[in-house]
């Protein structure tokens, strides 16, 4: 299969097995492991494309379900596709909309042909199938598009998960058949199976036989404990081809990025940095800071003294706290900028540690500084 997406493996860390690579796309080549900021509605909330480039973002994520509802994939196509519509000339990945259908809609009915559900905005009845999800993504024009999968809840029974995995495999085949722009867009398959090793094995075998240009590990970061996620990754990533990129969906806390890379993951995405930024929480080299707390009212130091981002070079904790407390948009911009920058730079450090065969040492140092080694450590 000819594909516009190619993965080049540069080096494997001797200490951990983590992979240093390059993801080649129609809109540039980007080093992995990488963190992909999420721009659900064709914008990373409060941040401009120029700012994202300034930070070193390579691929960003947009959401098929939301863009289908607003403004409509036909309008995006008319604009020349997502790249032209949002003025972003680097990589874009769109998810299939499956997760939103399963998480946002209170009413949904899963049939073999697809999913019937209600629009979360106005209650209208809608239907999304593998063919429709692929058609929408073809119109949106991202570099990487995702197969439409069923996203089971956690926990799910073995029998339910087995049926779900089999359906996801059949849907993946239908997505491939419906894909009309395979010379311009790489379609990735999504491995499901919950925490059941034999079902992950079955799902991976089914999808690898279809020869996708890349594979995602789905169904994680849905409420399971971190040790369960790590265990699932340990038995799932070895089932995937070494010459294809591996994408862990919906994961963005610093500890999970490092632990995912150690387990052979190349790509990550999450709304976490902008979502917690809007609530006044920031990630720093010394751990997380809840900037709304009273202790920062007279703190005239940067959010993170070890960070050289725009926010930390120019503004103090006291000022940012004032903005957030007053619901000023600029405060949200400053915390969001810093958090996205923090994760992009963290992945640069991870890549450097892989080059130097010292990722396990880096993990230990980072966890100690950040506070992940403490009892009752916070997730981010």
From Swiss-Prot:
Positions that bind substrate? 95-99, 149, 192, 219
Q: Name one GO biological process term.
A: tRNA-guanine transglycosylation
Q: What EC designation does it have?
A: 2.4.2.29
**Which GO terms of the cellular component aspect does the record hold?**
cytosol
Catalytic reaction annotation: 7-aminomethyl-7-carbaguanine + guanosine(34) in tRNA = 7-aminomethyl-7-carbaguanosine(34) in tRNA + guanine
Residues given in the record as Zn(2+) binding sites: 307, 309, 312, 338
Parts forming coiled coils: none
Q: In which pathway does it act?
A: tRNA modification; tRNA-queuosine biosynthesis
Cofactor binding: number and manner: Binds 1 zinc ion per subunit.
- Region: RNA binding; residue ranges are 250-256, 274-278
Its cofactor is:
Zn(2+)
Molecular function via GO:
metal ion binding; tRNA-guanosine(34) queuine transglycosylase activity
Give UniProt keywords alphabetically.
Glycosyltransferase, Metal-binding, Queuosine biosynthesis, Transferase, tRNA processing, Zinc
Q: Which protein family is named in the record?
A: Belongs to the queuine tRNA-ribosyltransferase family.
Tell me, how does this one assemble?
Homodimer. Within each dimer, one monomer is responsible for RNA recognition and catalysis, while the other monomer binds to the replacement base PreQ1.
What protein am I looking at?
Queuine tRNA-ribosyltransferase
UniProt source species = Geobacillus thermodenitrificans (strain NG80-2)
